[in-house]
Amino acid sequence: MKETNLSIKGVVKEIIKGDKFKVLLENNLLIEAHVSGKIRMHKIRILPGDSVEVEFSPYDLTKGRIIYRH
């Protein structure tokens, strides 16, 4: 059975080593996130200050995956 993932909007604060980012979420939590495969495949650039949507597993809310750049 597949668990539903949570998603929330945030702002990229800094780039960490390649495809990892520090993202400040709407609820003022600073988390580490990586880019999804489709963003990587389409070579979408994500820079500090970009507004993004981050998806989480319900099991680990400290790490996420960037699924959309606004």
Curated annotation (Swiss-Prot):
Q: Where in the cell is it found?
A: Cytoplasm
Extract the CDD domains matched here. Answer: S1_IF1
* One MF annotation (Gene Ontology) recorded for this entry: translation initiation factor activity
Where the record annotates domain S1-like, the positions are 1-70
Q: Mention any one GO cellular component term assigned to this protein in its UniProt record.
A: cytosol
Record's superkingdom?
Answer: Bacteria
UniProt keyword terms in alphabetical order: Cytoplasm, Initiation factor, Protein biosynthesis, RNA-binding, rRNA-binding
Predominantly, its location class is: cytoplasm
| Keyword DNA-binding tagged | no
> Gene3D superfamilies under this entry?
Nucleic acid-binding proteins (2.40.50.140)
Q: How does it assemble?
A: Component of the 30S ribosomal translation pre-initiation complex which assembles on the 30S ribosome in the order IF-2 and IF-3, IF-1 and N-formylmethionyl-tRNA(fMet); mRNA recruitment can occur at any time during PIC assembly.
| UniProt cross-references to PANTHER family, sorted A to Z | TRANSLATION INITIATION FACTOR IF-1, CHLOROPLASTIC
Tell me the protein family, please.
Belongs to the IF-1 family.
Described purpose of this protein according to its UniProt entry = One of the essential components for the initiation of protein synthesis. Stabilizes the binding of IF-2 and IF-3 on the 30S subunit to which N-formylmethionyl-tRNA(fMet) subsequently binds. Helps modulate mRNA selection, yielding the 30S pre-initiation complex (PIC). Upon addition of the 50S ribosomal subunit IF-1, IF-2 and IF-3 are released leaving the mature 70S translation initiation complex.
According to UniProt, the name of this protein is Translation initiation factor IF-1
